[in-house]
Curated annotation (Swiss-Prot):
Pfam families per the UniProt record, alphabetical: Toxin_20
Protein name from the UniProt record: U4-theraphotoxin-Hhn1p
Protein's job: Postsynaptic neurotoxin.
SUPFAM superfamilies assigned: omega toxin-like
Lineage, highest ranks first: Eukaryota, Metazoa, Ecdysozoa, Arthropoda, Chelicerata
Primary residence: secreted
InterPro entries reported for this sequence: Hwtx-2-like
Propiece residue ranges: 23-48
Keywords for the protein's UniProt record, in alphabetical order: Disulfide bond, Neurotoxin, Postsynaptic neurotoxin, Secreted, Signal, Toxin
Similarity annotation: Belongs to the neurotoxin 12 (Hwtx-2) family. 02 (Hwtx-2) subfamily.
Tissue-level expression: Expressed by the venom gland.
Residues in the signal sequence: 1-22
Length: 85
């Protein structure tokens, strides 16, 4: 009897945790589905790449290295261009 009283809540807790994990996994797979690109994010990345590469070229023409401070928000200066980290 005592074993049954312990087993029922334990099984219920495991079931709830398993269901929650399955729902999270399904949500992640839908977000990462191939063929559904985030075009707005790609446009921002493209603009940032152009903007940073132009600013790096301006710095290079002045015989100075690219300012690393120009590249922010997950970007770093590499090969005289800002690239996404």
């Amino acid at each position: 009897m005592k074993m049954t009283l312990i087993a029922i809540p334990t099984c219920a807790a495991v079931l709830v945790l398993h269901t929650t994990a399955a729902e999270e996994l399904e949500a992640e797979s839908q977000l990462m589905e191939v063929g559904m690109p985030d075009t707005e994010l790609e446009a921002v990345d493209g603009e940032r790449l152009f903007e940073c590469s132009v600013s790096c070229e301006i710095e290079k023409e002045g015989n100075r290295d690219c300012k690393k401070k120009k590249c922010k928000g997950g970007w770093k200066c590499k090969f005289n261009m800002c690239v996404k980290v």
